[in-house]
């Protein structure tokens, strides 16, 4: 699972997801990509599940890039615990995703295989996504 090696503080405030993504909104490495259409949180487990779905479908052909990183901790209180008494302990890591962010990129495979692989990955993610290619951008 992806997680930061070191952090200055164990816990963070939740924050608000407003606006669209300016950085990371265009294809940089691959020919095809998966772009987010709405904002949301994606956990490190979901990132890994989508990556495995892509690599298995392309049968280890081509190259896959993950264009985001889970750098925000989320906390959880134990089961059957009353409210209050402070914030829960850190449970895992997730990434804050804004609309327009390119999540995954693929290069070295035909468009049909890339479209199928990224569609499989999209089913593993909690936010709606769209297939993009370099020809759409040009």
Swiss-Prot record:
Gene3D superfamilies: Ribosomal protein L10e/L16. It comes from the Bacteria. One of its GO terms (molecular function) is structural constituent of ribosome. The keyword Hydrolase does not apply. Pfam families: Ribosomal_L16. One of its GO terms (biological process) is translation. SUPFAM superfamilies: Ribosomal protein L16p/L10e. GO terms for cellular component: cytosolic large ribosomal subunit. Keywords: Ribonucleoprotein, Ribosomal protein, RNA-binding, rRNA-binding, tRNA-binding. InterPro entries: Ribosomal_uL16 (IPR047873), Ribosomal_uL16_bact-type (IPR000114), Ribosomal_uL16_CS (IPR020798), Ribosomal_uL16_dom (IPR016180), Ribosomal_uL16_sf (IPR036920). The keyword Signal does not apply. Part of the 50S ribosomal subunit. Belongs to the universal ribosomal protein uL16 family. This is Large ribosomal subunit protein uL16.
């Amino acid at each position: 699972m992806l997680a930061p090696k070191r952090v200055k503080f164990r816990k963070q405030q939740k924050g608000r997801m407003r606006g669209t993504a300016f950085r990371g909104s265009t294809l940089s490495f691959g020919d095809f990509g998966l772009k987010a259409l709405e904002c949301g949180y994606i956990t490190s487990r979901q990132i890994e599940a989508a990556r495995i779905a892509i690599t298995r479908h392309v049968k280890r052909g081509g190259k896959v890039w993950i264009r985001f990183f889970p750098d925000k901790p989320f906390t959880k209180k134990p089961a059957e615990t009353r409210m209050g008494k402070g914030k829960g302990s850190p449970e895992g890591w997730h990434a804050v995703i804004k609309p327009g962010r390119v999540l995954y990129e693929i290069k070295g495979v035909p468009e049909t295989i890339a479209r199928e692989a990224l569609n499989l990955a999209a089913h593993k993610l909690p936010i709606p996504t769209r297939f993009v290619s370099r020809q759409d951008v040009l």
